Amino acid sequence: MELKDYTYELPENKIAAHPPKIRGTSRLLALNRKNGEITDSFYKNIADFFENGDILILNDTKVIKARLFTTKENGAERELIILERHSFDSDWHKHKVMYRGKIKAGDKLFVKNYSPDKNNGIFESAEITVEEILGDGLAIVSSKTDLRELCENFGTVPLPPYMRRDATPLDIERYQTVFAEEKGSVAAPTASLNMTDEILESLKKKGVKIGYLTLHVGLGTFMPIRVEKIEEHQMHKEYFEIPAETAEEIRKVHQNGGRVFALGTTVARTLEYAHNAIFEKSLNGNSGNREDLSKVSKNQNGDL
Protein backbone atom coordinates (compact mmCIF):
# COMPACT_ATOMS: atom_id res chain seq x y z
CA MET A 1 0.00 0.00 0.00
CA GLU A 2 1.31 3.45 -0.90
CA LEU A 3 0.83 6.60 1.14
CA LYS A 4 -0.46 8.53 -1.87
CA ASP A 5 -3.45 6.17 -2.09
CA TYR A 6 -4.74 7.68 1.15
CA THR A 7 -4.50 11.31 0.08
CA TYR A 8 -7.76 13.22 0.27
CA GLU A 9 -8.89 16.81 0.61
CA LEU A 10 -9.79 17.97 4.11
CA PRO A 11 -10.51 21.72 4.38
CA GLU A 12 -9.00 23.17 7.56
CA ASN A 13 -12.23 25.01 8.32
CA LYS A 14 -13.93 21.63 8.71
CA ILE A 15 -11.58 20.59 11.53
CA ALA A 16 -13.05 21.37 14.95
CA ALA A 17 -10.42 23.24 16.97
CA HIS A 18 -12.71 23.65 19.98
CA PRO A 19 -15.25 21.32 21.62
CA PRO A 20 -18.99 22.03 21.36
CA LYS A 21 -20.39 24.15 24.18
CA ILE A 22 -22.32 21.15 25.48
CA ARG A 23 -20.65 17.73 25.55
CA GLY A 24 -22.56 15.10 23.59
CA THR A 25 -24.23 17.42 21.07
CA SER A 26 -22.00 16.51 18.11
CA ARG A 27 -23.47 14.94 15.01
CA LEU A 28 -23.27 11.19 14.38
CA LEU A 29 -23.12 9.31 11.07
CA ALA A 30 -24.10 5.64 11.25
CA LEU A 31 -23.63 2.98 8.56
CA ASN A 32 -25.67 -0.22 8.63
CA ARG A 33 -23.21 -2.84 7.39
CA LYS A 34 -25.97 -5.29 6.48
CA ASN A 35 -27.96 -3.12 4.10
CA GLY A 36 -25.65 -0.15 3.51
CA GLU A 37 -28.16 2.32 4.94
CA ILE A 38 -26.63 5.58 6.23
CA THR A 39 -28.28 7.46 9.09
CA ASP A 40 -27.54 11.11 9.92
CA SER A 41 -28.11 11.51 13.64
CA PHE A 42 -26.66 12.98 16.85
CA TYR A 43 -24.23 11.45 19.31
CA LYS A 44 -26.78 11.73 22.11
CA ASN A 45 -28.95 9.22 20.19
CA ILE A 46 -26.24 6.57 19.97
CA ALA A 47 -28.31 4.14 22.07
CA ASP A 48 -30.70 3.86 19.10
CA PHE A 49 -28.10 1.71 17.34
CA PHE A 50 -27.64 -0.78 20.19
CA GLU A 51 -29.72 -3.76 21.29
CA ASN A 52 -30.35 -5.45 24.61
CA GLY A 53 -27.46 -7.84 25.28
CA ASP A 54 -24.76 -5.87 23.45
CA ILE A 55 -21.61 -4.61 25.17
CA LEU A 56 -19.76 -1.33 24.68
CA ILE A 57 -16.06 -1.26 25.58
CA LEU A 58 -14.53 2.06 26.66
CA ASN A 59 -10.92 3.18 27.16
CA ASP A 60 -10.56 4.66 30.66
CA THR A 61 -7.13 6.20 30.06
CA LYS A 62 -6.55 9.71 31.38
CA VAL A 63 -4.62 12.41 29.52
CA ILE A 64 -1.71 13.82 31.50
CA LYS A 65 -0.37 17.36 31.23
CA ALA A 66 2.52 16.01 29.22
CA ARG A 67 3.74 19.24 27.58
CA LEU A 68 6.47 20.93 29.61
CA PHE A 69 8.05 24.28 28.76
CA THR A 70 11.66 24.50 29.85
CA THR A 71 14.71 26.74 29.45
CA LYS A 72 18.34 25.86 28.87
CA GLU A 73 21.12 27.33 31.00
CA ASN A 74 21.54 30.10 28.40
CA GLY A 75 17.84 31.00 28.66
CA ALA A 76 16.77 29.46 25.34
CA GLU A 77 13.29 27.92 25.54
CA ARG A 78 12.77 24.25 24.77
CA GLU A 79 9.46 22.39 24.66
CA LEU A 80 9.14 18.77 25.78
CA ILE A 81 6.31 16.26 25.52
CA ILE A 82 6.79 13.54 28.11
CA LEU A 83 5.86 10.33 26.32
CA GLU A 84 6.64 7.25 28.37
CA ARG A 85 9.06 5.71 30.81
CA HIS A 86 12.42 4.86 29.26
CA SER A 87 11.56 1.22 29.96
CA PHE A 88 8.49 -0.29 31.55
CA ASP A 89 10.70 -1.78 34.26
CA SER A 90 12.21 1.59 35.25
CA ASP A 91 10.83 4.16 37.66
CA TRP A 92 9.21 7.43 36.64
CA HIS A 93 12.42 9.51 36.77
CA LYS A 94 13.65 8.58 33.28
CA HIS A 95 11.48 9.14 30.23
CA LYS A 96 11.39 9.21 26.47
CA VAL A 97 10.36 12.67 25.25
CA MET A 98 9.61 14.48 22.05
CA TYR A 99 11.38 17.83 21.93
CA ARG A 100 11.23 21.05 19.95
CA GLY A 101 14.42 23.09 19.47
CA LYS A 102 18.06 22.04 19.58
CA ILE A 103 19.30 20.00 22.52
CA LYS A 104 22.20 17.61 23.05
CA ALA A 105 23.19 14.95 25.54
CA GLY A 106 24.29 16.53 28.80
CA ASP A 107 22.10 19.64 28.48
CA LYS A 108 20.32 20.83 31.62
CA LEU A 109 16.74 21.99 31.19
CA PHE A 110 14.82 23.91 33.83
CA VAL A 111 11.03 23.77 34.10
CA LYS A 112 9.46 27.18 33.56
CA ASN A 113 7.24 28.62 36.30
CA TYR A 114 9.14 26.63 38.96
CA SER A 115 10.25 28.78 41.88
CA PRO A 116 12.57 27.29 44.54
CA ASP A 117 11.02 29.62 47.12
CA LYS A 118 7.40 29.04 46.16
CA ASN A 119 7.75 25.28 45.62
CA ASN A 120 10.31 24.51 48.31
CA GLY A 121 9.57 21.23 50.06
CA ILE A 122 7.33 19.91 47.28
CA PHE A 123 9.95 18.95 44.69
CA GLU A 124 13.58 18.06 45.18
CA SER A 125 14.39 19.63 41.84
CA ALA A 126 12.80 20.91 38.64
CA GLU A 127 15.95 20.22 36.63
CA ILE A 128 15.86 17.80 33.70
CA THR A 129 18.99 16.27 32.18
CA VAL A 130 19.19 15.18 28.55
CA GLU A 131 20.67 11.67 28.65
CA GLU A 132 20.56 10.61 25.00
CA ILE A 133 19.40 11.89 21.61
CA LEU A 134 17.49 9.18 19.73
CA GLY A 135 16.77 10.97 16.45
CA ASP A 136 13.43 11.94 14.85
CA GLY A 137 12.96 14.60 17.53
CA LEU A 138 13.13 12.09 20.38
CA ALA A 139 15.39 11.93 23.41
CA ILE A 140 15.83 10.24 26.77
CA VAL A 141 15.78 12.59 29.77
CA SER A 142 16.06 12.11 33.52
CA SER A 143 15.15 14.05 36.64
CA LYS A 144 15.56 13.68 40.39
CA THR A 145 11.84 14.39 40.62
CA ASP A 146 9.10 12.10 39.34
CA LEU A 147 8.41 13.53 35.89
CA ARG A 148 4.70 12.79 36.24
CA GLU A 149 4.58 15.15 39.21
CA LEU A 150 6.39 17.88 37.29
CA CYS A 151 3.87 17.48 34.47
CA GLU A 152 0.90 17.57 36.82
CA ASN A 153 2.07 20.80 38.47
CA PHE A 154 3.75 22.66 35.61
CA GLY A 155 2.64 20.98 32.39
CA THR A 156 -0.16 21.68 29.92
CA VAL A 157 -2.42 19.40 27.88
CA PRO A 158 -0.65 18.37 24.62
CA LEU A 159 -3.38 19.09 22.08
CA PRO A 160 -3.06 17.38 18.67
CA PRO A 161 -1.09 19.44 16.11
CA TYR A 162 -4.09 19.71 13.76
CA MET A 163 -5.92 21.90 16.29
CA ARG A 164 -3.33 24.63 15.70
CA ARG A 165 -3.89 26.38 19.01
CA ASP A 166 -2.52 26.49 22.53
CA ALA A 167 -4.20 24.66 25.38
CA THR A 168 -6.57 26.59 27.63
CA PRO A 169 -7.78 25.87 31.19
CA LEU A 170 -11.02 24.50 29.67
CA ASP A 171 -9.05 21.76 27.91
CA ILE A 172 -8.10 20.23 31.25
CA GLU A 173 -11.77 19.24 31.56
CA ARG A 174 -12.96 18.93 27.96
CA TYR A 175 -9.94 17.17 26.46
CA GLN A 176 -10.70 14.32 28.85
CA THR A 177 -13.42 11.69 28.87
CA VAL A 178 -16.03 11.67 31.65
CA PHE A 179 -14.88 8.16 32.65
CA ALA A 180 -11.10 8.79 32.56
CA GLU A 181 -9.37 7.03 35.46
CA GLU A 182 -5.89 5.73 34.61
CA LYS A 183 -3.27 8.44 34.00
CA GLY A 184 -0.87 7.87 31.13
CA SER A 185 -2.02 9.17 27.72
CA VAL A 186 -0.54 12.05 25.76
CA ALA A 187 -3.76 12.31 23.72
CA ALA A 188 -7.40 11.57 24.44
CA PRO A 189 -9.34 8.65 22.92
CA THR A 190 -11.14 11.12 20.69
CA ALA A 191 -14.28 9.12 19.91
CA SER A 192 -15.09 9.06 23.62
CA LEU A 193 -14.93 12.81 24.19
CA ASN A 194 -18.61 13.17 23.30
CA MET A 195 -19.77 10.51 25.76
CA THR A 196 -21.69 11.76 28.80
CA ASP A 197 -22.98 10.13 31.97
CA GLU A 198 -26.52 10.59 30.65
CA ILE A 199 -25.75 8.81 27.38
CA LEU A 200 -24.09 5.95 29.26
CA GLU A 201 -27.17 5.67 31.44
CA SER A 202 -29.44 5.52 28.36
CA LEU A 203 -27.33 2.61 27.07
CA LYS A 204 -27.56 0.75 30.37
CA LYS A 205 -31.34 1.22 30.49
CA LYS A 206 -31.52 -0.43 27.09
CA GLY A 207 -29.71 -3.49 28.45
CA VAL A 208 -26.28 -2.66 27.06
CA LYS A 209 -23.34 -3.71 29.21
CA ILE A 210 -20.41 -1.33 29.67
CA GLY A 211 -16.85 -2.65 29.93
CA TYR A 212 -13.51 -0.91 30.38
CA LEU A 213 -9.92 -1.42 29.34
CA THR A 214 -6.89 0.86 29.40
CA LEU A 215 -4.68 1.84 26.49
CA HIS A 216 -2.33 4.78 27.00
CA VAL A 217 -2.11 6.71 23.73
CA GLY A 218 1.56 7.31 23.01
CA LEU A 219 4.08 8.67 20.57
CA GLY A 220 2.44 7.18 17.48
CA THR A 221 -0.41 9.68 17.62
CA PHE A 222 2.03 12.56 16.98
CA MET A 223 4.49 10.89 14.59
CA PRO A 224 3.84 11.41 10.87
CA ILE A 225 4.23 8.63 8.32
CA ARG A 226 7.46 9.43 6.45
CA VAL A 227 7.66 6.40 4.17
CA GLU A 228 5.90 5.83 0.85
CA LYS A 229 5.18 2.15 1.53
CA ILE A 230 2.81 2.07 4.50
CA GLU A 231 3.99 -1.41 5.46
CA GLU A 232 7.43 0.07 6.20
CA HIS A 233 6.07 2.49 8.79
CA GLN A 234 7.27 1.57 12.28
CA MET A 235 4.51 1.67 14.87
CA HIS A 236 5.44 2.60 18.42
CA LYS A 237 4.59 0.58 21.50
CA GLU A 238 1.63 1.43 23.72
CA TYR A 239 0.85 0.19 27.21
CA PHE A 240 -2.51 -1.54 27.65
CA GLU A 241 -4.42 -3.55 30.22
CA ILE A 242 -7.61 -5.59 29.87
CA PRO A 243 -9.19 -6.48 33.23
CA ALA A 244 -10.31 -10.08 33.68
CA GLU A 245 -13.92 -8.99 34.27
CA THR A 246 -13.97 -7.15 30.93
CA ALA A 247 -12.65 -10.22 29.11
CA GLU A 248 -15.27 -12.40 30.83
CA GLU A 249 -18.13 -10.02 29.89
CA ILE A 250 -16.97 -10.00 26.26
CA ARG A 251 -17.00 -13.81 26.18
CA LYS A 252 -20.48 -13.97 27.73
CA VAL A 253 -21.96 -11.43 25.33
CA HIS A 254 -20.42 -13.20 22.35
CA GLN A 255 -21.66 -16.61 23.49
CA ASN A 256 -25.19 -15.23 23.92
CA GLY A 257 -25.27 -13.75 20.43
CA GLY A 258 -24.76 -10.14 21.46
CA ARG A 259 -22.52 -7.67 19.68
CA VAL A 260 -19.24 -6.22 20.95
CA PHE A 261 -18.79 -2.51 20.24
CA ALA A 262 -15.42 -0.76 20.52
CA LEU A 263 -15.71 2.97 21.17
CA GLY A 264 -12.89 4.38 19.08
CA THR A 265 -9.72 3.08 17.49
CA THR A 266 -7.80 2.74 20.77
CA VAL A 267 -10.30 0.16 21.99
CA ALA A 268 -10.53 -1.51 18.58
CA ARG A 269 -6.79 -2.09 18.24
CA THR A 270 -6.49 -3.35 21.81
CA LEU A 271 -9.29 -5.89 21.35
CA GLU A 272 -7.91 -6.97 17.98
CA TYR A 273 -4.48 -7.52 19.49
CA ALA A 274 -5.77 -9.46 22.50
CA HIS A 275 -8.55 -11.34 20.67
CA ASN A 276 -7.02 -14.80 20.96
CA ALA A 277 -6.11 -14.34 24.62
CA ILE A 278 -9.66 -13.22 25.43
CA PHE A 279 -11.39 -16.15 23.75
CA GLU A 280 -8.83 -18.79 24.73
CA LYS A 281 -9.38 -17.66 28.32
CA SER A 282 -5.66 -17.10 28.90
CA LEU A 283 -6.64 -13.60 29.96
CA ASN A 284 -7.63 -14.08 33.59
CA GLY A 285 -6.67 -11.27 35.91
CA ASN A 286 -7.45 -13.25 39.03
CA SER A 287 -4.93 -16.00 38.31
CA GLY A 288 -1.69 -14.07 38.42
CA ASN A 289 -0.63 -16.31 35.55
CA ARG A 290 2.18 -14.99 33.32
CA GLU A 291 -0.14 -15.58 30.37
CA ASP A 292 -2.39 -12.92 31.87
CA LEU A 293 -2.11 -10.02 29.41
CA SER A 294 -3.54 -7.63 31.97
CA LYS A 295 -0.32 -8.19 33.92
CA VAL A 296 2.32 -8.80 31.24
CA SER A 297 1.08 -6.42 28.54
CA LYS A 298 3.43 -3.68 29.71
CA ASN A 299 5.66 -4.01 26.65
CA GLN A 300 3.28 -5.09 23.92
CA ASN A 301 3.77 -3.67 20.46
CA GLY A 302 1.13 -1.18 19.38
CA ASP A 303 1.21 -2.45 15.80
CA LEU A 304 -2.24 -3.99 16.00
Predicted regions mapped to residue ranges:
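Surface-exposed, charge/polar-rich loops and edge strands
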Residues: 1-285, 289-304
